[in-house]
């Protein structure tokens, strides 16, 4: 069985390790733990993780955030992956830093990457793992905040939160969304 795990982010060194790129950060950690290397391909860089008979296609789109749907649709079609086996890892301003929430569907919550994925796929009924980045910014400072780097305080627990996000991804693929939500959403 195949799964498409897409981490949202923007390409380019200037965006590396920014809050908006937490999706890339999580997938990098998942790949590194299994000694996988991403290979550049159409619409993004991919790595394939084998996990107990399942194939997880890890995708970091090269389309920029607000065109992420093109990459998701292409890889779903190329790998013949059904919508229920798609998981998007995304930053979330509405959640305190490090809070992780798995959802089976929902609104885009103003996130342009999710908005484009929903428009491209014609539905909002796809799973997403929201990684809280907090919202400690002044009025009108949202763009600078999401494109900024994590604070020293955030970095103290970053590795542990990213590791938990990786565990959630694996559980999503092995145990399913309901069990995974019940296990992790209360933490």
From Swiss-Prot:
Annotated site, Stabilizes the basic form of H active site to accept a proton, chain positions: 91
Subcellular location: Cytoplasm
A Pfam family hit: Pept_tRNA_hydro
Annotated positions for site Discriminates between blocked and unblocked aminoacyl-tRNA: 10
GO CC aspect terms: cytoplasm
Top-level EC class as recorded in UniProt: hydrolase
Protein name: Peptidyl-tRNA hydrolase
The species this protein was found in: Phocaeicola vulgatus (strain ATCC 8482 / DSM 1447 / JCM 5826 / CCUG 4940 / NBRC 14291 / NCTC 11154) (Bacteroides vulgatus)
């Amino acid at each position: 069985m195949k799964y498409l795990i897409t981490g949202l982010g923007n390409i380019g060194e200037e965006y590396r390790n920014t809050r908006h790129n937490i999706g890339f950060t999580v997938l990098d950690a998942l790949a590194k733990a299994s000694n996988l290397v991403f290979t550049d391909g159409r619409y993004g860089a991919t790595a394939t993780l084998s996990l107990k008979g399942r194939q997880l296609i890890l995708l970091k789109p090269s389309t920029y955030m607000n065109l992420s749907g093109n990459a998701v649709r292409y890889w779903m079609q190329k790998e013949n992956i059904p919508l229920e086996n798609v998981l998007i890892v995304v930053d979330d301003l509405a959640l305190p830093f490090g809070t992780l929430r798995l959802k089976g569907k929902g609104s885009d919550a103003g996130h342009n990457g999710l908005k484009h994925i929903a428009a491209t796929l014609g539905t909002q009924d796809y799973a997403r793992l929201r990684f809280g980045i907090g919202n400690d910014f002044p009025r009108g400072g949202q763009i600078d905040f999401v494109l900024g780097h994590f604070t020293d305080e955030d970095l103290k627990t970053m590795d542990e939160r990213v590791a938990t996000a990786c565990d959630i991804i694996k559980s999503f693929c092995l145990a399913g969304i309901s069990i995974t939500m019940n296990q992790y959403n209360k933490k």
